[in-house]
Amino acid sequence: MKRVNVIQAKAFLKVIALLVPLLLNANGPAFALTEQASTPPHDSVASVSAPTAEAAVAAHAHGEEKAGDVIMHHILDNDVFSFEPFGEVHLPKIPPIAGVDISITKHVVMLWVVSAILLILFSLVGSKYKKMTARQAPTGLVNAMEALVEFIRIDVAKANIGVGYEKYLNYLLTVFFFVLLCNLLGLVPYGATATGNINVTLTLATFTFFITQVAALKAHGIKGYLAHLTGGTHPALWIIMIPIEFIGLFTKPVALTIRLFANMTAGHIVILSLIFISFILQSYIVAVVMSVPFSIFIYLLELFVAFLQAFIFTMLSSLFIGLASAHEGHEEHEAGVAHH
């Protein structure tokens, strides 16, 4: 397999990493405070400068509060897409149905965008792959996609699930590319991180949970599935083991949910906080020395985290499926070790 030419990709990522902090700085609120001159000796001037100083302190506090509002507006889900300096797009409101608000939000839009991109991307790659002969080596985008697919197939699905991994490969590939693209689009200007919404990560983890339970039922049957809840202990300990094992069934999807949500949210908070330090402190030196360089560093780190979290979510999903569908040979090995 030929090596993928990544020079253009690296250049593109560097440009994005440089532009995002600058765009955020350019569009952020400028908190200008009037510098106070030396205090005159006259009481009348002093009485005027005192309220001015109080106003400066109030403006500084307002700047910090407004910076926090901007950060939370960027992180949380809402029905407004900001395209500064061009304006805003307000998404349509849908009346609640049975008390449930089903209005379209920016994270919902990003989920649709990710789904559309994946459909188009894999349709193009699949059509090119079908046209290739046995002697042709994949190049460009097809080569890159093949490398990622083979990595998930061999090093994730097959390594963690073992025999019968093919049944779960489509799900694992879908989860990997879906989470990866959601993470990456959150780093694009004017984009939003759908995986920074705990409802999205909880839904993905719920899919993994149900697939894991179905895999366990298929591998061991209802009797074996229920027997697993006892942990292979003496019946006298079942009153302790069954609640523990039952709770353990739900700790795995909870861990998947919190891990992805927290990691994708934390990075954006750090980047925006570093950027707004220069506005709050009103210092160009802070902006040049700390805000912009550190923001670029964290941004590049977020690119790595985007791939890493997609891999971790997929790897843990395959690991949970593999543990749930462990074959009898594995159980006999454990029984033999316990016997000896």
From Swiss-Prot:
It holds the Pfam family ATP-synt_A. The keyword Ion transport applies. The gene is atpB. The lineage of its organism: Bacteria, Pseudomonadati, Chlorobiota, Chlorobiia, Chlorobiales. It is found in: Cell inner membrane. Belongs to the ATPase A chain family. CDD domains: ATP-synt_Fo_a_6. It comes from the Bacteria. The chain crosses the membrane at residues 107-127, 172-192, 197-217, 236-256, 269-289, 296-316. One of its GO terms (cellular component) is plasma membrane. This is ATP synthase subunit a. PANTHER family: ATP SYNTHASE SUBUNIT A. It is a multi-pass membrane protein.
